[in-house]
Amino acid sequence: MTYYLDFEKPIQELEIKIEELKKLSDGSDIDLTQEIKRLNKKLKELKTEVFSNLTPWQKTQIARHPERPYTLDYISIIFEDFIELHGDRRFGDDPAVIAGIGKIDGDPYALVGHQKGRTIKERIYRNFGQAHPEGYRKALRVMKLAEKFSIPVITMIDTPGAFPGIGAEERGQAEAIANNLMEMSLLKIPLIGFVIGEGGSGGALALSVCDKIFMLEHAIYSVISPEGCAAILWKKNSDVGVEDYMRAAEELKLTAQDLKKFGIIDDIISEPLGGAHREPQEVGKRIKAKIVSVATELIKIPPDELIKKRYEKFRKIGNFWGSSNRRK
């Protein structure tokens, strides 16, 4: 059964009506072909109208959609012979992070990515995609292994943030994230990142120091969630609500379109009408095509130059022009 977001209710009603007419037509001699065709045309127009005018908060909702494809879904679409590797060799394994080696069109690649989980049981097992320090250390271990064999690394980012629990802090959550930032900036292999859902704070950044970073059309990437931002800035004597979340999402500039404009990401991968969960196979094919084309170019760049370009890429983020006139 399809899960609909609140702003998708008109679409839901129309899709239900079309399904009812199809069942009625199949079980009788009544020919409803033209009516179904008319409603399908109306449905496409409605979807185009709704999804071409999404607010940042609505995009946030789509990025969190429970049916949205996760890292393991894309692995099954994109990779051949994927072998998952476990453990950080220091503490243990973290199911919130998937890491391993596989092939794309016969060529080897390493992949690391967050995994949220689909069912309640799996979400608890995956900790809702919130990685512990051992998850980030496992990811780095696999990236170092890829460097040893000159294999490009693909990262898939989809997390509300790194897990802030006591155990995670005791095992060095901040150090693990910071170490990933440093080590990834020095890897002598191509790094290609994809924000496929939520890109939340340092938990996302720990897999994002890449030569090229791409976002799906309805993904988000931000220093904090709209809810967290609203609670910090505007919570007084009463709880914050949806209007505050909408305002925060607008102010944070967390959409792929905003981030492309600011030069934070390199490009946007379009999604089918309704979001990636409507046609995951098609989105997987688009990601695969981007991986192959970008990796083909990055592999040609000498390692030292690759590291230099990566450094320059991130040094440019946040640069701005100011007035030379200073107040005395």
Swiss-Prot record:
| Single Gene Ontology MF annotation | ATP binding
Q: Where found?
A: Cytoplasm
Got a GO cellular component term for this one? acetyl-CoA carboxylase complex
Residue pairs linked by disulfide bridges in the UniProt entry: none
* Pfam families found in the cross-reference section: ACCA
Going by the UniProt record, its keywords in alphabetical order are: ATP-binding, Cytoplasm, Fatty acid biosynthesis, Fatty acid metabolism, Lipid biosynthesis, Lipid metabolism, Nucleotide-binding, Transferase
Please state what class of enzyme this protein is. Answer: transferase
Pathway where it operates: Lipid metabolism; malonyl-CoA biosynthesis; malonyl-CoA from acetyl-CoA: step 1/1
- Record-listed E.C. numbers: 2.1.3.15
Which residues does the UniProt record annotate as the domain CoA carboxyltransferase C-terminal? 38-297
Q: Name one GO biological process term.
A: fatty acid biosynthetic process
Instruction: Cite the InterPro entries for this sequence.
Output: Acetyl_CoA_COase_a_su, ClpP/crotonase-like_dom_sf, COA_CT_C
What domain of life is recorded for the organism? Answer: Bacteria
Quickly give the catalysed reaction.
Answer: N(6)-carboxybiotinyl-L-lysyl-[protein] + acetyl-CoA = N(6)-biotinyl-L-lysyl-[protein] + malonyl-CoA
Record-stated family:
Belongs to the AccA family.
What PANTHER family does this protein's entry cite?
A: ACETYL-COENZYME A CARBOXYLASE CARBOXYL TRANSFERASE SUBUNIT ALPHA (PTHR42853), ACETYL-COENZYME A CARBOXYLASE CARBOXYL TRANSFERASE SUBUNIT ALPHA, CHLOROPLASTIC (PTHR42853:SF3)
Q: What does this protein do?
A: Component of the acetyl coenzyme A carboxylase (ACC) complex. First, biotin carboxylase catalyzes the carboxylation of biotin on its carrier protein (BCCP) and then the CO(2) group is transferred by the carboxyltransferase to acetyl-CoA to form malonyl-CoA.
Subunit structure comment from the entry = Acetyl-CoA carboxylase is a heterohexamer composed of biotin carboxyl carrier protein (AccB), biotin carboxylase (AccC) and two subunits each of ACCase subunit alpha (AccA) and ACCase subunit beta (AccD).
UniProt protein name: Acetyl-coenzyme A carboxylase carboxyl transferase subunit alpha
In its UniProt entry, the species of origin is given as Thermodesulfovibrio yellowstonii (strain ATCC 51303 / DSM 11347 / YP87)
